[in-house]
Regions:
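PLP-dependent enzyme catalytic core of the Aspartate aminotransferase-like
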Residues: 1, 121, 130, 148, ...
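N-terminal "arm"/small-domain region of PLP-dependent enzymes with the aminotransferase-like
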Residues: 2-63, 71
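Conserved PLP-enzyme active-site core in the AAT-like
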Residues: 2-5, 14-20, 81-283, 288
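Short loop segments at secondary-structure junctions
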Residues: 36-37, 225-229, 257, 316-321
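Conserved N-terminal alpha-helix of the aminotransferase class I/II PLP-enzyme fold
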Residues: 41-90, 115-122
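Active-site beta-loop-alpha junctions enriched in small/polar residues
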Residues: 158, 187-189, 292, 317, ...
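Short, well-ordered beta-strand elements within core beta-sheets of diverse protein domains
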Residues: 253-262, 310-317, 373-377
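Conserved small-domain helix->loop->beta segment predominantly found in fold-type I
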Residues: 272-341, 357-363
């Protein structure tokens, strides 16, 4: 971005922040597809490795293309620092592992992506870290679950796939009063619709695989927070364990950021149109969309989000059998477990993202056998609605 004292708006930062041009002055950011770097002297090599002078030493540690992506994400999020990872789950796992050690305790909302819940319930205990899962809406449960060893609060909001929205500022206050840090998975909101750091969160994580790429091409993740948090808790983990984002994927994600605002705007319009079209449909028993006034957390949404969502969820009659009949009748919309794509996609959480949970656990989270998660793409809303309504006739 040009040197200036101006504060640019998010749409401008998405296009210009972090740009590092080579001596050739290319208009499109360069892809530095290299493992290592040549040093002008042995002394320079020693100084770079010791950290006495800045510079790249190995692309597992950092890379100019990765740096451009990280700087652009930090500018968009309003964070002091960002670090990229190979996947969203690498970002989540690193964000949690970097804040705990044996004997520590984590409090997390129950409504989590299946892999996130596995990390908390199955992986962290192998290293002596215990956890308590709570109803994220109930602030009293966050307080009650806190112990003297609690070091981390973790939530995703809006949640996957029920689109619950938690009060980030209120939970951050509880965490900080307990001496803990709050980590927020902000993937469903995107940096454009929700800013957890300004609401009191200490760390924000993303699966860049979703909206940031936006076209179903590559995997990636991001961890954002203060410079001190990143250096004290994550720098060495990322450097030594190697969950590194590839330079090629960083370049694809960097280019994806340029169109994020226009894509998310169109996707949100489509998701809202679909939600309104399905509301009250005789084959739909439940509809959840953060942009509608009937959302259970509508007040929280108005307080902390700038718009609704690119996703909506709805439950069809007939349980799993009804859901499968609906899914198999779709002609335009694809069945997959991804989201945030240019193409509209649907998922059956019971048999995919949340399959490992027991029926009772899914029921507790509001994930019925007939629940469908819809991720809006860039198609014309009328075509999407027509496909959905036609498929509902098969239920």
């Amino acid at each position: 971005m040009p040197a200036s004292t101006k504060t640019y708006r998010p749409e401008t930062r998405l296009v210009h922040s972090g740009t590092l041009r080579s001596q050739f002055g290319e208009t499109s950011e360069a892809l530095f597809l290299t493992q290592g770097y040549i040093y002008p002297s042995a002394e320079d090599c020693e100084a770079r490795f010791s950290g006495k002078i800045p510079g790249y030493v190995y692309s597992r540690y950092s890379n100019p293309t990765m740096s451009m992506f990280e700087q652009r994400m930090a500018a968009l999020e309003g964070a002091e620092a960002a670090r990229s990872t190979a996947t969203g789950m690498a970002a989540v796992t690193t964000a949690l592992m970097g804040l705990v050690r044996a004997g520590d305790h984590v409090v997390a909302a129950k409504a989590l992506f299946g892999s996130c819940r596995w990390v908390i319930e199955e992986w962290l205990p192998r290293f002596g870290v215990t956890s308590t899962l709570v109803n994220g809406i109930d602030l009293a449960q966050w307080k009650k679950a806190t112990t003297r060893n609690t070091k981390v609060f973790f939530m995703e909001t809006p949640t996957n796939p029920t689109l619950e929205v938690y009060d980030i500022a209120a939970v951050a206050d509880i965490a900080h009063n307990a001496g803990a840090k709050l980590v927020v998975d902000n993937v469903f909101a995107t940096p454009l619709y929700q800013s957890p750091l300004t609401l009191g969160a200490d760390c924000v994580v993303y699966s860049a695989t979703k909206h940031i790429d936006g076209q179903g091409r590559v995997l990636g993740g991001v961890i954002l927070g203060s410079e001190k948090l990143i250096l004290d808790h994550y720098h060495q983990i990322l450097r030594q364990t190697g969950p590194s984002l590839s330079p090629f994927n960083a370049w694809v994600l960097l280019k994806g950021l340029e169109t994020l605002s226009v894509r998310v705007q169109r996707q949100t319009e489509n998701a809202g149109a679909v939600a309104n079209a399905l509301a009250g449909h005789k084959k739909v028993t439940r509809l959840i969309y953060p942009g509608r006034p009937d959302h259970p957390q509508a007040e929280t949404i108005r307080k902390q989000m700038r718009a609704g969502s690119t996703l909506c969820s709805f439950e069809v009659k007939g349980g799993k059998e009804g859901a499968f009949r609906f899914l198999n009748a779709l002609e335009l919309i694809g069945i997959t477990n991804n989201l945030g794509d240019a193409k509209s996609l649907v998922t059956h959480p019971t048999t995919t993202t949340h399959q490992r949970l027991t029926p009772d656990q899914r029921a507790e989270l509001g994930i019925g056998d007939g629940l469908i998660r819809f991720s809006a793409g860039l198609e014309h809303a009328d075509d999407l609605i027509a496909d959905l309504l036609t498929a509902l006739e098969k239920v």
